[in-house]
């Protein structure tokens, strides 16, 4: 994503959630953030995005994915009792992440992987080998668009599938979010997923605050009454 597009999205997220004072309770005091504070959060968001090498998704797009029941994994990184149990994006799993990468413990990383891996899409991988064939067979296979090759010494081969097996698809769409645009928990978890080789990771910057402010439905964890 181009830098100006990241800036535009970050600004849009900041302004869209800025109408709710609760969103910025952990970052600013007062009903409206100062322009200097908005600038700091915006550029910090941009720098995190560049460093994390993940993609970004806005509220409307995520809402469309949820409504369309897209195949994806949504990760809420907020503490369970304080946030996730009360409200979360429908279908989201909960794996808590800290505000900085240095504070991300081995147990927290393991918890994220333990929950994500079983939910990944599956894909079939083919193990192939080049098998020697006659010139006649080579021509026949080539006409049928099979993968073939001919060596300089006129030895003919075709690519034969010797084994098929199913593996987890690391290109599965994964969306990570936390509380609001100034919250770095989602950055920490999203950046970690990218480092683990996942290639389709999105950070939902506005988080649960933007989701709720947009009037979207939420799920919650029902706790038994005493």
Regions found by a protein language model. Give the residues of each.
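Bacterial N-terminal signal peptides that target proteins for export
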Residues: 1-9
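Flexible, polar/low-complexity N-terminal or interdomain linker segments that lie immediately upstream
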Residues: 16-88, 222-226
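Mid-length scaffold segments of soluble, non-membrane domains
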Residues: 77-126, 167
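Catalytic cysteine-centered active loop of the rhodanese-like fold, especially the PTP/DSP P-loop
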Residues: 110-134, 158-210
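Second-shell loop/turn segments in exported
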Residues: 46-53, 99-106, 162, 179-181, ...
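Solvent-exposed loop/turn segments at secondary-structure junctions
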Residues: 79-83, 99-102, 180-184, 207-211, ...
